[in-house]
């Protein structure tokens, strides 16, 4: 960890952070260029496979797991819940094959909509109690919707609207800003130190990260099994909301979505981060849900 701290500090100084006044198009071009240079030979679409695009040994192991994926039961149960809550009538195309367009900016409300938030809104609209947003049922529903969108190309639109750009830039600032006792940013781990080890885990490239959410993590599955005695259909699942909070916790920063208020609602800071973060994977095909470390 000490070596990683030193490397991250040096690389964040030497690296090429995205310009504050750059357009979303310029941001995407620079973001891709950084990773193409850092990992020569890795094609754009392969970045959607996370660490398995940069580590051949881990890739072989992952491919073996994907032959009998542990998330299949979760997809099936997520589909059943999708139907139970009547979600098809709230989404275009009945909620199938639409994840590639999320998050999106709504010009009428001036807000960014995430898939998780729209699922929650529909559940409440249909007279049901809201769900927790980090894991469990909502992660299973999102996993099913992601599965129906596999192969679709990520296409987050950042319109030339001051309100949309303000949210986008808020997320961009969060991605590059250092925080917590470890003084790490998202970019420190997933740009400058990507491909290095930290606490036994290989740090994944930021490019393509959002293409496979919600994810089924072995770490989360083990935690569920230890607590409940079994993993269950949703035990290994987590939304990107869960991952953001976990990352903040790991760098000993304030977890913004912690507490009763944020159990069933998304923190605007994480919405902004998801808007920027996902747009940096535009052009990459969705492949979620997926197994991760």
Residue ranges and their predicted role:
Residues 1-7:
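Bacterial N-terminal signal peptides that target proteins for export
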Residues 8-15:
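Bacterial N-terminal signal peptides
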Residues 16-22:
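Sec/Tat signal peptide C-region and signal peptidase I cleavage site
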Residues 23-73, 83-140, 147-151, 157, ...:
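Electron-transfer interface patches adjacent to heme c in soluble/periplasmic c-type cytochromes
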Residues 73-74, 166:
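An amphipathic alpha-helix/helix-turn recognition signal
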Residues 152-170:
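Solvent-exposed, charged amphipathic helical/linker segments at domain boundaries
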């Amino acid at each position: 960890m000490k070596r990683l701290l030193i490397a991250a500090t040096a690389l964040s100084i030497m690296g090429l952070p995205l310009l504050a006044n750059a357009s979303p198009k310029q941001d995407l071009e620079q973001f891709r260029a950084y990773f193409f240079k850092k990992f020569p030979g890795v094609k754009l679409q392969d970045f959607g496979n996370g660490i398995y695009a940069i580590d051949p040994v881990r890739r072989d192991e992952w491919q073996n797991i994907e032959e009998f994926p542990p998330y299949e039961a979760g997809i099936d149960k997520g589909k059943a819940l999708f139907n139970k809550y009547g979600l098809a009538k709230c989404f275009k195309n009945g909620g199938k094959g639409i994840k590639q367009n999320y998050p999106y900016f709504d010009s009428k409300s001036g807000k960014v909509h995430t898939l998780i938030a729209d699922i929650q809104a529909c559940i409440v609209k249909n007279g049901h109690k809201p769900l927790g947003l980090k894991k469990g049922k909502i992660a299973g529903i999102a996993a099913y919707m992601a599965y129906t969108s596999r192969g679709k190309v990520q296409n987050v639109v950042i319109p030339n609207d001051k309100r949309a750009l303000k949210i986008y830039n808020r997320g961009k600032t969060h991605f590059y800003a250092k925080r917590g006792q470890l003084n790490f940013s998202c970019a420190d781990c997933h740009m400058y130190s990507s491909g290095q080890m930290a606490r036994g885990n290989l740090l994944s490239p930021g490019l393509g990260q959002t293409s496979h959410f919600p994810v089924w993590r072995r770490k989360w599955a083990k935690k569920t099994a230890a607590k409940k005695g079994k993993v269950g259909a949703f035990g290994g699942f987590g939304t990107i909301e869960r991952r953001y909070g976990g990352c903040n916790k790991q760098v000993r920063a304030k977890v913004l979505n912690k507490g009763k208020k944020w159990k069933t609602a998304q923190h605007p800071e994480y919405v902004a981060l998801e808007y920027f973060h996902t747009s940096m994977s535009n052009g990459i095909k969705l492949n979620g849900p997926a197994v991760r470390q």
